[in-house]
Design a protein with these regions (language model features):
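Residues on the lipid-exposed face of transmembrane beta-strands in outer-membrane beta-barrel proteins
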Residues: 111-119, 145-151, 158, 185-191, ...
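Short loop/turn motifs that connect adjacent beta-strands in outer-membrane beta-barrel proteins
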Residues: 52-53, 76-86, 116-125, 150-153, ...
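Surface-exposed coil loops of outer-membrane beta-barrel proteins
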Residues: 96-98, 161-231, 241, 248-274, ...
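Transmembrane beta-strands of outer-membrane beta-barrel pores
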Residues: 93-97, 119-121, 128-134, 151-153, ...
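Transmembrane beta-strands of outer-membrane beta-barrel proteins
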Residues: 85-89, 122-128, 156, 200-209, ...
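N-terminal periplasmic/intermembrane-space "pro-region" immediately following the signal or transit peptide
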Residues: 25-103
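Outer-membrane beta-barrel pore domains
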Residues: 273-469
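Outer-membrane beta-barrel translocator domains and adjoining extracellular loop/strand segments
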Residues: 98-101, 136-139, 168-174, 198-201, ...
Length: 469
């Protein structure tokens, strides 16, 4: 039933889109994970003001980024992104398996078309991708397509929204953009709010809630993915995040409203001998502080199985540090991040992202919903971002790790044949003018990695050409 409702809603969206007046002007309500470098620059410029920016919960509404010093940055950003149509061609010699928050190319070969619009309190995007990669079955994808409506200080919408929950740049343990976004409905805070009573010490509060449908081929088909996140910012420097994501319902599973309430408030774990759901939850912290003209960030994220008392068990974690500064108004950053998805801080295998009933695990179309390294893995990465001009940037990183360290289990996307590895990655973005830009990525690894039972090349490159009009 949920699947039918979502599909009908999406069809309604397309009808509205096709017959909407042509007087709509270009616009986008969201800043997406791929715009992370722009958000870093905003973080730097806004830190000295009493207007904290929550950079741990993507997508980010434009209203959350408004500060006195950010206005010019926002104008420059949108002046380069104010064309309402986009045509892209992407090519890679192999699947690009080691990705981070900036990487949006999930397929070997594809071409896509986007159209964005905004009118009064409504904004949306129609994005259609033709996937011609032999490794995937989906011929057409709608990643990024959405219809959003502003209701007071909230955004209500439907679509395929890319999310990234957590302060990390390389891994988000609970929700990342590694897999394709799923169809669903959502409610997000527009600009956040503050309590005016005895709870004012909490500071600025933002929230995000969604119900998605996992429409892939699973052990339990028609599973729903339900997520909620709240962040609080007691001061300009500190951001605390609390997240929970649940797999609920599906074929031959408890899915009544009563079961939903029992699961939502953790009133009970089982019904008729069946686990009500598969939940993971946890918290994260990011602290920024200035030293001379440098912004220093320290962060961590801890996620585990959600228990009856709302306390995560069998924990996995990410921690990192980053330095951000500007040179002649251009971004420079250096960061180091470490992730460990072996449960109980490295002592328990075959637990993270797995479940006894939802046997397909915490994945969508055989790609992780959380950390790209999947379960039982470790990953360390050193990254630098250099903006050479407003139209030219370089992202370079060195990394090492080990996938599925105990080499067991049938559902881990990295299989059971990988060894310790090390490598480097470079990404270059260049805009020739307002209309035409390209992205070039090169990944070099010292071992032939296995991903979804396919052997990857040691050197992978991808090229993206984008025409905006």
């Amino acid at each position: 039933m949920e699947s039918l409702i979502l599909k009908k809603s999406l069809i309604t969206f397309f009808i509205i889109f096709l017959f909407t007046s042509s007087t709509l002007f270009s616009g986008e309500i969201w800043i997406e994970p791929k715009d992370e470098l722009f958000v870093k620059k905003l973080e730097f410029t806004s830190n000295s003001l009493d207007h904290p920016i929550d950079s741990t919960s993507y997508p980010i509404s434009k209203a959350k980024l408004k500060t006195r010093t950010s206005d010019e940055l926002l104008r420059n950003f949108y002046s380069r992104n104010n064309l309402k149509n986009k045509f892209s061609i992407k090519y890679a010699n192999n699947l690009f398996p080691i990705r981070d928050i900036l990487d949006s190319n999930r397929h070997e070969k594809s071409f896509s078309f986007e159209k964005t619009f905004e009118k009064n309190s409504t904004a949306g995007k129609l994005s259609v991708t033709k996937n011609i990669s032999p490794i995937f079955d989906d011929e057409y994808l709608f990643s990024g397509t959405h219809l959003s409506m502003i209701l007071g200080n909230s955004v209500l919408g439907i679509g395929f929204i890319e999310r990234w929950w957590g302060p990390g740049n390389d891994n988000s343990l609970i929700l990342s953009n590694y897999s394709d976004p799923q169809p669903g409905i959502y409610l997000e805070s527009l600009s956040g709010f503050r309590f005016e009573n005895f709870m004012s010490f909490i500071g600025k509060v933002n929230y995000s809630f969604f119900i998605n449908h996992l429409d892939d081929d699973r052990v339990i088909n028609n599973t729903n993915l339900i997520g909620a996140r709240i962040t609080i910012q007691p001061n300009t420097n500190l951001t605390l995040g609390f997240s929970r994501v649940t797999m609920f319902g599906g074929d031959n599973r408890p899915d009544s409203f009563e079961s939903f309430i029992d699961n939502l408030f953790r009133l009970k774990r089982t019904e008729n001998g069946l686990d009500l759901s598969n939940e993971i939850a946890g918290y994260d912290l990011k602290y920024n502080f200035r030293f001379n003209k440098v912004l220093i960030s320290s962060y961590f994220q801890l996620i585990g199985e959600d228990e009856l008392r709302f306390t995560p068990s069998t924990k996995i974690f990410t921690l990192g540090n980053e330095i951000i500064f500007l040179k002649n108004g251009l971004l420079r950053s250096v960061g180091i991040e470490y992730s460990n998805t072996i449960s109980n801080f490295g002592d328990r295998y075959n637990t993270a992202y797995e479940h006894s009933s939802y046997k397909s695990g915490y994945r969508y179309k055989n790609l992780p919903l959380g950390a790209f390294i999947d379960g039982d893995s470790i990953f360390l990465k050193l990254t630098t971002n250099i903006e050479l001009s407003e139209y030219f940037f370089i992202n370079f990183s060195l990394f090492q790790g080990e996938f599925n360290k105990d080499n067991s289990g049938l559902t881990n996307v990295w299989g059971i044949s990988n060894e310790e590895y090390a490598g480097s990655k470079i990404k270059i973005g260049y805009s020739f003018n307002k209309n035409f830009n390209l992205d070039l990525g090169i990944l070099a690894v010292n071992k032939n990695l296995y991903f979804n039972s396919k052997e990857m090349d040691k050197i992978t490159f991808n090229l993206g050409l984008n025409y905006n009009f």
